[in-house]
Amino acid sequence: MAMKKLLIASLLFSSATVYGAEGFVVKDIHFEGLQRVAVGAALLSMPVRTGDTVNDEDISNTIRALFATGNFEDVRVLRDGDTLLVQVKERPTIASITFSGNKSVKDDMLKQNLEASGVRVGESLDRTTIADIEKGLEDFYYSVGKYSASVKAVVTPLPRNRVDLKLVFQEGVSATIQQINIVGNHAFTTNELISHFQLRDEVPWWNVVGDRKYQKQKLAGDLETLRSYYLDRGYARFNIDSTQVSLTPDKKGIYITVNITEGDQYKLSGVQVTGNLAGHSAEIEELTKIEPGELYNGTKVTKMEDDIKKLLGRYGYAYPRVQSMPEINDADKTVKLRVNVDAGNRFYVRKIRFEGNDTSKDSVLRREMRQMEGAWLGSDLVDQGKERLNRLGYFETVDTDTQRVPGSPDQVDVVYKVKERNTGSFNFGIGYGTESGVSFQIGVQQDNWLGTGYAVGINGTKNDYQTYSELSVTNPYFTVDGVSLGGRIFYNDFQADDADLSDYTNKSYGTDVTLGFPINEYNSLRAGLGYVHNKLSNMQPQVAMDRYLESMGEYGKDSFAADDFTFNYGWTYNKLDRGYFPTDGSRVNLTGKVTIPGSDNEYYKLSLDTATYVPIDDDHKWVVLGRTRWGYGDGIGGKEMPFYENFYAGGSSTVRGFQSNTIGPKAVYKKGAHSSNDEYDDYEECTESNGCQSDDAVGGNAMAVASFELITPTPFISEKYANSVRTSLFWDMGTVWDTNWQASRYPDYPDYSDPGNIRMSAGIALQWMSPLGPLVFSYAQPFKKYDGDKAEQFQFNIGKTW
C-alpha cells in the first residue's frame, strides 16, 4: 500500500492533520463511507475538481463545504499519491419520532416545532440541533414554573445507519407562588396592588382569574399592570427598579419581590399638538382637551393617541404617526404633553376583495360594504362592512386586511377574509325534545341559498302534539336599496291537550307577505299582510274559552272556524357583533299584528324581545347576557283576543326548569266538561257547579319574561370548536296573566289577573351548533313556583324547531 499523507484537520468534529503545505494536482477523487448520499451529490458540494491544483486552504474549504451539507458527522481528507481520498461518516437518518411523558405540550405542536428546525422523519439527525431543542423545551417549562422538568432525547440505532428518535419528558409540577412582595410602595397597600395581578399568592374561591402557578409571561403582564396602575393615577416618574424571582430548594415554591419607586403625583398643565394635521386641527383639538388640574393618566394618553389615529383613518390617512412626549416639571409637579402628529399620505381604495367565500357569491358580500372602491379609505366604513358581514350569520369569522398596492404611494386594497359556516341542511330524521317528545323531521333549510343570500325553507315536523309544514322564501335585497321581501305558506294541526294546554284541537293554514325597510345601519321596519284560517274542534268548555266564544256570539259550541286578515308590522334594532353566538351589542325586536276589515276576529297583539351582551374580558370569553320578552294583546270593539293566540311561558325558550307552556293561568272547566287534569281520570266529567280547577295551562293575554346569563368558556373544548359551542349559567324568571280574568266572580280560584305570580329558576345550559342543527341542553332548578306548575329540570332539543 502506498504511503498516505495526512493533509488537514477535520473541522468541528474530527480531522486529520496537515503534514505538507505544498500543492499538488488532483488526478482523482475517491470517497469512503458514503451510504445514503450519492457520489455525484457529494462532488457537487466540493469546491475542488479533478485537475485542480490544491493546497491546505483548498482542503479546508472542502471540509467546510461537506460539513455545510448537513449530511456528515465526520469528514477526513487524505492524499494517496495524486488521489484525494475523502473519508466521511454520514449522519444517521431519522426513521421515527415519538414522544413520551408530555402533557402540557401536545404531540402535534411538538412535531410542528421539530419540523421548523429541520428535524423530521427521513432527514439526517443533527445532534447539535437536538441538543438545542432539548434546552429550548426545558426553558419553556421553566417559563411556566415547572423548574424540575427535564427533556432528554433518546437515540436508538437501527440497521442501515438509521435511528429512532424519542423525546422523553419529565414535566414535574408547577412551582406555587408562596409570597409576592412589593417594596417601595407608600400610596397603595401591597394587597391593593396585588389584587390586580393574575399571579397571586392567595386565590379566593370566587376568583376565577387568579393563579398561584408561576408563569414568566404572566409575571411580565402583571408588572405592566402595576406600571399602568401608577401611571393612570398621576405617578409620571414611577419606575420598577428590579424584580427578583427566588426558587425554594425543592423547586416547588416561588417568592417574588418587586422593588419600585413611586415618585410624586403630577398634574397635566396642557397639551400642545404639532405636525401635519391634514386640515383637521379643530377635530383633533377636541380630542386633546383636558380638565383643569387633571392628573396625568397614561391610559388616557394612549387612548387620545388612538382616537387621533381613528379620526385621521376615517379621512383616508391609513398610516398616521402619533407620538406623545411628556415634559415633566419636577418643580411644580406638572406634565406638559407634546403630541406630534404626522397624518402621512391619504390613501384611496383600488379594489375590495373577498377570500374564503367558496359558497357565498361576491355580490352577496359586496352589497354589505359601506366602503366604496375609488373613494378614500375610511377605517370606520371598513369596520362597518365587517360588522354587517358578521351580522349576516353566514360566517364563523370575518377579518379585514388593508394591503398597500406595490408601486403606488396612495392606493390600497381592502381584503375581507371570511370563514364560512354551514348555513343550512337537508335533513330527514328523528329527533327528541323534552317539550315535543319524538319528532320526525324532513326538509331543507338554507339561510344562504346557493350563496345568493336568499333564505329558503321547505320544512315539516311531526311530534306528540303537532303536525306542521311550511314553505318560506326571503330575499334580503329585493331592491338595491336593501328592501327585503319575504313570504311563507303553512299548515298546522295542533293538539293542545297533548301540549299541556287546555283541551282543544286547531287545524290552521295561512300565508303572509312582508316587506322590510332599512332605516339606517342598525334599524329596520317591517310591514306586511297575512291570512290565516283556524278550525277549532273538541273544545271542552272552560272559563277563558267561553269568555271568548261569548264575545264572538258562539257561546256553548264545541267547534268553531274563523278567517282572519292581519296587518303585520315590526321594528328591529340590531347592533350585535355577529349573527350567531354574539358576544357584544344589543338587539331589540318589536312585532305586532292587528286584524283588518273582513276578519271574523277583532284583536291586536304586540311582542317585544330584547337581548344585550356585555363582555367582561378583552377576549369576549366571559359575557353577561340580559334578555327580556314582553307580550300583550286584547280584543277590539267588545270582542276578546282568541284564546289560541294567548301568550305562554315555560320551557327552554322562556323559563327553563318548567314544562313547556305550563306557567300562568290554568283552565277552570265548566260543569259537564271533560278534563285531562292529572287530578281526575282522563276525560272524567266535571260535576262542580262552580267549575273544576285543573292543571291545564290556558296562557294569558299578557306576558313578561326575563333572563340573566353568564356565558363562560366551555371546559375541555379546543379553540377549533370554541365558536360552535357555548355554555352559560342562567337565572330565569317569568309570569303570564289574564287581564280579563274576573277575580270577584271566581273567588274560589287563584287570581289569574295578578302579574305578580312570578316563577323563577336557575341552572346551566349548553348550546352546540352541530352539523345536524342546533342542540340545546339545559338543567334548571325552579326555586319559586306555584300550585299546578310542572317542573322539568333537564330539557333538550335536537334539530331545528319551528
Swiss-Prot record:
Subunit organization: Part of the Bam complex, which is composed of the outer membrane protein BamA, and four lipoproteins BamB, BamC, BamD and BamE.
Task: Tell me which domain of life the UniProt entry assigns to the organism this sequence originates from.
Answer: Bacteria
Q: What does this protein do?
A: Part of the outer membrane protein assembly complex, which is involved in assembly and insertion of beta-barrel proteins into the outer membrane. Constitutes, with BamD, the core component of the assembly machinery.
Recorded family membership: Belongs to the BamA family.
Organism the protein comes from:
Escherichia fergusonii (strain ATCC 35469 / DSM 13698 / CCUG 18766 / IAM 14443 / JCM 21226 / LMG 7866 / NBRC 102419 / NCTC 12128 / CDC 0568-73)
Question: Example GO biological process term?
Answer: protein insertion into membrane
User: Which protein are we looking at?
Assistant: Outer membrane protein assembly factor BamA
A GO CC annotation recorded here is: Bam protein complex
